[in-house]
Curated annotation (Swiss-Prot):
Keywords: Amino-acid biosynthesis, Cobalt, Diaminopimelate biosynthesis, Hydrolase, Lysine biosynthesis, Metal-binding, Zinc. One of its GO terms (biological process) is lysine biosynthetic process via diaminopimelate. It comes from Marinobacter nauticus (strain ATCC 700491 / DSM 11845 / VT8). This is Succinyl-diaminopimelate desuccinylase. Binds 2 Zn(2+) or Co(2+) ions per subunit. Catalyzes the hydrolysis of N-succinyl-L,L-diaminopimelic acid (SDAP), forming succinate and LL-2,6-diaminopimelate (DAP), an intermediate involved in the bacterial biosynthesis of lysine and meso-diaminopimelic acid, an essential component of bacterial cell walls. Zn(2+) 1 binds at H68, D101, E164. InterPro entries: ArgE/DapE_CS, Bact_exopeptidase_dim_dom, DapE_proteobac, Peptidase_M20, Peptidase_M20_dimer, Peptidase_M20A. It catalyses: N-succinyl-(2S,6S)-2,6-diaminopimelate + H2O = (2S,6S)-2,6-diaminopimelate + succinate. NCBIfam families: dapE_proteo, PRK13009.1. PROSITE patterns: ARGE_DAPE_CPG2_1, ARGE_DAPE_CPG2_2. Pathway: Amino-acid biosynthesis; L-lysine biosynthesis via DAP pathway; LL-2,6-diaminopimelate from (S)-tetrahydrodipicolinate (succinylase route): step 3/3. Its EC number is 3.5.1.18. The active site is at D70, E135 (proton acceptor).
Length: 376
């Protein structure tokens, strides 16, 4: 049975074992399809990360597609029903690491471009792709560096469509028009190490920090708003002790905020410090801001995505800001409108990752219709 161009390309991409930060030739394959359409490609390598900025056209407005070729590790391959880098279509599903996150989306957008350019050779504006091999990892040498490069030469994106797997039950039923911020805290609480039989000669760091952690876990941070759910606080790691007969003199605690626009990173940091200080702790605290929250309100890009989904599938879509962070956090501050639209996310990062094969063809049609809405 012959496969659609989208599915053939998705399989070719999945065969390339591009575990972060290895691109494994994916971007070269993509560029081989884009160049005949009139795209010029620029390879931007930072550290061990390969990035591609491909563009067709010199004028605005610019519709960019952002995505990543890297995938998360597979874990023991013996746990997979099918080899993760030997894609197979079985019972209507395309199986393989990256099928949903996000090589299926990459293939869908490229084939959408092929059809759009064939039907609209004199389209207005420009089409661009920002592709990285460092999204699933530290994300330090990927999209953020490309954005910095583009800004330094005053090259702007008006709209950015990110191919992250946003859908829940049916392709296109959810699009992300924003994301919460992510703030990490790394807390070290100091006590005095000693023998468990002589606690009066020691100071248990775990006992000291426990009431403060309880207070942080019970703290009401905010109510959320019309666009974002309430801010959440989660303790992600607690480490202490070097032996069963030793009072721990130090306790390490890692925690994370997923926060909405009712708070800022700075306001959360201040409130955490105030709670810790109320408990008279001896501590060190370091912060890492992974990304600030962003929101794309209803406008040209959101409307184009909604109209495209309605035209292709006949269904209305839900706007959502739930889920984890994405590279949209690096693009939104440039002023570009940003939405995420991709396949169903039920199996992402899991053993036996898969996506319904026909969904990738549907997604390609939606992407093509977005191009029509904005640039035809």
């Amino acid at each position: 049975m012959s496969l659609s161009p989208t599915l053939e390309l998705a399989k070719d991409l999945i065969r390339r074992q591009s575990v972060t930060p290895d691109d494994a030739g994916c971007q070269e394959l993509m560029m081989s399809r884009l160049a005949p359409l009139g795209f010029s490609g620029e390879n931007l390598r930072f550290g061990e990360t390969d990035n591609l900025w491909a563009r067709k056209g010199n004028n605005g407005p610019v519709l960019a597609f952002a995505g990543h070729t890297d995938v998360v590790p597979t874990g023991p391959e013996k746990n997979w029903a099918h080899p993760p880098f030997d894609p197979i279509i079985k019972d209507g599903y395309l199986h393989g690491r990256g099928a949903a996150d996000m090589k299926g989306s990459l293939a869908a957008f490229i084939t959408a471009c092929e059809r759009f350019v064939a039907n609209h050779p004199n389209h207005r504006g420009s089409i661009a792709l920002l592709i990285t091999s460092d999204e699933e990892g530290p994300a330090q040498d990927g999209t953020v560096k490309v954005v910095e490069t583009l800004e330094a030469r005053n090259e702007k994106m008006d709209w950015c469509l990110i191919g992250e797997p946003s859908s829940t039950h049916q392709v296109g039923d959810v699009i992300k028009n924003g994301r919460r911020g992510s703030l990490h805290g790394y807390l070290t609480v100091r006590g005095v190490q000693g023998h468990v039989a002589y606690p009066h000669l020691a100071e248990n760091a775990v006992h000291n920090v426990a009431p403060a952690l309880d207070a942080l876990a019970k703290e009401f941070w905010d109510n959320g708003n019309d666009f974002f759910p309430p801010t959440t606080f989660q303790i992600t790691r607690v480490e202490a002790g070097v032996g069963s007969n030793i009072v721990p003199g130090e306790c390490l605690v890692h925690f994370n905020f997923r926060y909405c626009t009712e708070n800022t990173a700075e306001s959360l940091e201040e409130r955490v410090v105030a709670i810790l200080d109320r408990h008279n702790l001896k501590y060190d605290l370091q912060w890492h801001l992974s990304g600030r929250p962003f929101l794309t309100d209803k406008g040209a890009l959101v409307s184009a995505a909604q109209n495209a989904i309605r035209t292709v599938t006949g269904r209305e879509t839900e706007l959502s800001t739930s889920g984890g962070t994405s590279d949209g956090r690096f693009i939104a501050p440039t002023g570009a409108q940003v939405v995420e639209l991709g396949p169903i996310n039920a199996t992402i990062h899991k053993v036996d990752e898969c996506v319904k094969a026909e969904d990738l063809d549907t997604l390609s049609e939606i992407y093509e219709q977005i191009l029509v809405e904005l640039l035809a």
